[in-house]
Amino acid sequence: MWRRRFATSAATTTVATVSRFKPVIGLEIHVQLNTRTKLFSRCPTSDASPNRRVAPFDMATPGTLPALNHQCVHRALKMSRLLKCHVPKWSRFDRKHYFYADMPAGYQITQNEYPIARDGLFGYWVFGEETDTPYWKEVEIVQLQLEQDSGKTINILDSSPSESSESRSLIDYNRAGCALIEIVTSPCFETAIEAIRFVQTLRLLIIHHNLSDGELHRGHLRVDANVSLTVDGKPGTRTEIKNMNSIRTIHTAINFEIARQFEILSNSSGKVIRETRGVDSEGRTVPMREKDAEDTDYRFMVEPNLPILKIRKEWMEGAERELETQGIADFEWLRDRCGFDPRSSIHIAEEPDLLAFVKRCVRFKDSGVTADEILYWMRELKTIMQRSKGNYPPKSDFFAKQFTTLIHHSGRLTRLRLLDLLRFYATSSESEEDVLLEDVMEFIDKNDFWRINDTEKIDKFVEESMAKNGKLAEKVRSGHAKSFNKMRNLMIETSEKRIELEDAEDAIRRFLQR
Amino acid sequence: MNRFFKIVLTSTRRASTNGSGKRKTPFEGDKVHIPDEPYNSKVRFFICFKKKLKHGIQIDESLLSEMPPIDAKLISHLERLSLVRFDSEQAVANLRNSIRMAKRLELVDVEDVEPMHTVWESQECPTFDDVEEEPLPIDKVFRNAAVRFDDFFVTPPGNVPLESNERFDLNVINKWDTIGKPVAPEAKTIRLAEGRRK
């Protein structure tokens, strides 16, 4: 029910946007760094049961002082280089005050006025549904700041109406004080697709350079989006969608919010309220319980316990050196070196199994095989594996080699024969019999599976088949379409799939015209 | 004036002599900056900010910006910021007085002076290697916890909306210092309750 309603409102948005409204979206991305210890304490960050990863500083024990983790600075510098940011000679930490039980000091140490890096630029490909042509987009990065994470809260709500309500919160400080990098972009996205492709690309880059584990579902990447609609070019009121931790959620929530604001604004008296919104399980944005109609006053002040952080030249050089040795990320390699289109390179790089398969294929790739051919036959292979209930993609090196060899020779084999061979090799190598299998070239040669191109030979097959199946031949002659196809299939079958479908059809037509 | 120097001199002299009951400093011979006896801070004001003050040691209140009226909105804003609840008109009136006192700082000439944020201004922030240390054992983590549930701290739910702020007699708060009473009248709610009882 909701889906239908949502779909219609989204559709109207796109129509009306052209005339009056334009969405403006800005993102704040919190990246949890995968350092061994926290940002300001040497408490380990490994997984553990609740409150087992807490140092005195993390629970704001009076008298404890912050001790900055060098690795966090190092990773922030790497990130600044990746996002082509300007890194000032020094930066400073600030306190941002608010009361939450999972923030035991009553403030978060962050970087507000003098962040570690600012004014960056990040380019990436945007692609939508299958039919869209990808386009290049550059995003302005406003700033990049190091900050502490909060602990985790479990809310236990007691719905009983009695006054002695049992509502309470359970707090786990394991995450409190872990290192985050917050990336703030300018409001330069116009669609939800642009926003999610940015997050996807950034995520792959972050994982490649070992800045974060980048697992969205585990909260390593949390995204806030500021959404507003400009009306006839005039900026509108924005709402902030908090804490989205899956690509799909980001997409649906932003679209939902655009549709919601559009519905409000298209009513002449409607007004969007500036507020913070959460996301429910369906991707709808809902007002958060907290009331912050008036601007929250965070009472920013300079962190008095941390002197100015001067960025040394050798730190910067170290970060650059490491980025260089790490080389380009897999999706960039696929896109720029192997010729995959932007959509497939992101798609493949996001799936470790697919990536491993493609890497194997590229290793065995004969010079003649293009990325598009690999993609085409991978799709066919996927269907084959789904039908035969095998695992896709097959994991063995042997199969990858046969796969690329087959693609390389695809011009010399009929499509049906090639599919047959793929099925045979994929299912057999899956069952670990590949040691017994011979190389596909030998196999084809031995059985003479090569495609028949000689028209005379093909004509002979037609004559034979027509002669053998008298009744069917009659029907074909009378122009019965189904029989025509049946005859064609028969021919292909008797030729052991060595005649291409089109060739067979042409030959029958030729025969009939004679 | 004379009194101030006397205090400073006596305190320095006392610190340098060694004996029981005397002020001690970590290193012998260090100056003691905190005087033993309190002195009128207005004297200090006069010394530091002579230029700004018109009539000697008296602070000219007319130079200060006007006190903002304390209204229900401001009270609730302050309560939200501090997470502290005012319990009576007296509490708010005291705060108002403190604000008025603090306003004197407006007279300090800070033009072209960078605010000081830390005593480590000339230092660089030290960084530490990313090497794990043993976290606190679980019993120490919970040593100060009033309520514990399994291995979690327990707190009241957050984001509780504040109650109505029309609790105080704003007139009393804003006029208290001109009434001249040392203690502000009791809160409206209590008075009302008592009135009903009577």
From Swiss-Prot, chain B:
A GO cellular-component term linked to this record: glutamyl-tRNA(Gln) amidotransferase complex
Keywords: ATP-binding, Ligase, Mitochondrion, Nucleotide-binding, Protein biosynthesis
Compartment(s) where it occurs, according to its Swiss-Prot or TrEMBL record: Mitochondrion
Highest taxon of the lineage: Eukaryota
Main localization of the protein described in the UniProt heading: mitochondrion
Signal peptide: none
A GO BP entry: mitochondrial translation
GO molecular function, one term: glutaminyl-tRNA synthase (glutamine-hydrolyzing) activity
UniProt EC number: 6.3.5.-
Pfam families the record matches: GatC
Enzyme class: ligase
InterPro entries noted in UniProt: Asp/Glu-ADT_sf_sub_c, GatC
Paired cysteines (S-S): none
Reactions catalysed according to its record: L-glutamyl-tRNA(Gln) + L-glutamine + ATP + H2O = L-glutaminyl-tRNA(Gln) + L-glutamate + ADP + phosphate + H(+)
SUPFAM superfamilies the record matches: Glu-tRNAGln amidotransferase C subunit
Subunit structure: Subunit of the heterotrimeric GatCAB amidotransferase (AdT) complex, composed of A, B and C subunits.
Family per record: Belongs to the GatC family.
Stated role: Allows the formation of correctly charged Gln-tRNA(Gln) through the transamidation of misacylated Glu-tRNA(Gln) in the mitochondria. The reaction takes place in the presence of glutamine and ATP through an activated gamma-phospho-Glu-tRNA(Gln).
Further comment: This protein may be expected to contain an N-terminal transit peptide but none has been predicted.
PANTHER family: GLUTAMYL-TRNA(GLN) AMIDOTRANSFERASE SUBUNIT C, MITOCHONDRIAL
Name of the protein in question: Glutamyl-tRNA(Gln) amidotransferase subunit C, mitochondrial
